[in-house]
């Protein structure tokens, strides 16, 4: 089954950078919403021996100063305080978004600093020319605001990564393929024309975070530099790729980015408890290949993904896409092998749910976006 393909980053002899250390995986495993997910992802990548074809870089921990390039001092200090005490009932926590979906558990500050550091380290590798593609599957926490946690996200590592890349690259394109709207990243850059944010996501009444309608286009100097593609339940690979390619083609021509940050949350994949989109890693892989053919400095991040085995399948497959490797269908024996039953294969089959996306509505959205991008100079 091992058919060598043209690597997706062909033309670049530099191997991708892969952010990893045992300590990093161990701290990322501690997130209550995705326990041990980081270990499952890394173990499967290792089982397919993909780590041997990448440059493994140990992440630094983000300093207070680095985190404060986006987050407020007051928020960071509060996060540090409750993290040391494991104080879930601090009276100020509610105003900082802590509690409910972002519990203030002990050690949460160290977790946030580790993730932020992972993405900043990856961005720095791109700046230093150590690679053309840098991967931090444990990053991609796109909901956090400058002064509040939101949607399982305590620190917005995607924003920190973009800010770091801006030291070298003038125009940065952020593409968010998570099931949820990348609201924290969009908000952070809504007033600037230096960062364009593109988000494909589920948009429906009562679905978190409730933002990201196609009329959300940015503000002030950043007007038309936010692109939102609202999608309904049941979408599958072919239609999703058609939408993604159509939008990215227009975006690339209009904006001419110098670097790309790609958030690849796996909660769009069939079998996710979110039970919304009906994608497989192959569809996301086609979108990834489309971005990689631009041959720009590219920072790859994870994000959502609550069916842990499917998330590991997805990100391992996508790592294979980046390396130009076709992976064997049989899951290799490794520490988490039993999680891949009953069939123990890499492929994911879409479920039999109806696709709620009507072709004329999709065309309307694409036409609207194309019209908006005419204003981008």
From Swiss-Prot:
Gene Ontology biological-process annotations: cellular response to forskolin; cellular response to trichostatin A; heterochromatin formation; mitotic sister chromatid cohesion; negative regulation of gene expression; negative regulation of osteoblast differentiation; negative regulation of protein ubiquitination; regulation of protein stability
SUPFAM superfamilies reported in the protein's UniProt record: Arginase/deacetylase
Pfam family name, one: Hist_deacetyl
Textual note on the cofactor: Binds 1 divalent metal cation per subunit.
Main enzyme class: hydrolase
Compartments in which it is found: Nucleus; Chromosome; Cytoplasm
Keyword Hydrolase recorded: yes
Binding, substrate: 101, 151, 306
Any one Gene Ontology molecular-function term assigned to this protein's record: metal ion binding
Chief site of localization: nucleus
Superkingdom of origin organism: Eukaryota
UniProt family annotation: Belongs to the histone deacetylase family. HD type 1 subfamily.
Function, as annotated: Histone deacetylase that catalyzes the deacetylation of lysine residues on the N-terminal part of the core histones (H2A, H2B, H3 and H4). Histone deacetylation gives a tag for epigenetic repression and plays an important role in transcriptional regulation, cell cycle progression and developmental events. Histone deacetylases act via the formation of large multiprotein complexes. Also involved in the deacetylation of cohesin complex protein SMC3 regulating release of cohesin complexes from chromatin. May play a role in smooth muscle cell contractility.
Protein's name according to its UniProt entry: Histone deacetylase 8
Native species: Rattus norvegicus (Rat)
